[in-house]
Amino acid sequence: MGTPRIQHLLILLVLGASLLTSGLELYCQKGLSMTVEADPANMFNWTTEEVETCDKGALCQETILIIKAGTETAILATKGCIPEGEEAITIVQHSSPPGLIVTSYSNYCEDSFCNDKDSLSQFWEFSETTASTVSTTLHCPTCVALGTCFSAPSLPCPNGTTRCYQGKLEITGGGIESSVEVKGCTAMIGCRLMSGILAVGPMFVREACPHQLLTQPRKTENGATCLPIPVWGLQLLLPLLLPSFIHFS
């Protein structure tokens, strides 16, 4: 008589443990978004109806990378489970106005459906991204696009910018695999649109730029803007300049 009773108790214990484990499962919102918007404050919606059940020890995450050039804004966003990490909210402004602006936000959290941000307003101040005055001397090709820019009009730069930037961001992770081409006005020196930060939440970012001399204009004494000639350009011009130099000497 004792043995069946013990078996019943064991079954109840197993069922209880199973119910307890299922009650501790972590559920996260899941979704991806890659878009370019002219009015992200009103047009971008970060809500999703998909749900993901996480493995043991995982967290929920929501991560977004925002890149603004001129009047266009590229947005790459991901929500879902993350296998490891620490609970934290991280906001980084990689490139500040005036000119090109890059901001990232990531939230790692431990409660079900805690990755529930639905808009950009909580960490992106749209009123601060518009320049009030522009330069009359510095103009730069300006665009941001997923993949490649098919049009990059030369636009007057905001006061406070000193050079033109051109580069490409290769982004992988968090379900995202994409490249973003960026051109525009900036005050930063070199290929540092991401300020040297290579990881944004589960996303890894690789920044690549063409020859930096081609993206660093300077102003002449009369206020005009010119581009330095790279070394290979001088090598091409030298044979043309030598005969004139010999003739006048």
Swiss-Prot record:
Residues 223-249 form a propeptide. Its main location: membrane. It is a lipid-anchor; GPI-anchor. Glycans are attached at residues 45, 159. It is found in: Cell membrane; Membrane raft; Cytoplasmic vesicle, Secretory vesicle, Acrosome; Secreted. Residues 140-211 form the UPAR/Ly6 domain. The keyword Amino-acid biosynthesis does not apply. SUPFAM superfamilies: Snake toxin-like (SSF57302). One of its GO terms (cellular component) is side of membrane. A lipid is attached at residue 222 (GPI-anchor amidated asparagine). Pfam families: UPAR_LY6. GO terms for biological process: binding of sperm to zona pellucida; fertilization; flagellated sperm motility; regulation of flagellated sperm motility. InterPro entries: Fert-Immune_med_protein, LY6_UPA_recep-like, Snake_toxin-like_sf. N-glycosylated; by high mannose and/or biantennary complex and/or certain types of hybrid oligosaccharides; possesses different oligosaccharides chains according to its subcellular localization in the testis. Residues 1-25 form the signal peptide. Disulfide bonds: none annotated. Detected in testis and spermatogonia. Not detected in spermatocytes. Detected in blood leukocytes. Keywords: Cell membrane, Cytoplasmic vesicle, Glycoprotein, GPI-anchor, Lipoprotein, Membrane, Secreted, Signal. The keyword Transport does not apply. Plays a role in fertilization by controlling binding of sperm to zona pellucida and migration of spermatozoa into the oviduct. May play a role in signal transduction and promote protein tyrosine phosphorylation. Interacts with VAMP3. Interacts with LY6K. Interacts with DPEP3; co-localized on the cell surface of spermatocytes, spermatids, and testicular spermatozoa, co-localized only in cytoplasmic droplets of caput and corpus epididymal sperm. Interacts with ADAM5. This is Testis-expressed protein 101. The lineage of its organism: Eukaryota, Metazoa, Chordata, Craniata, Vertebrata.
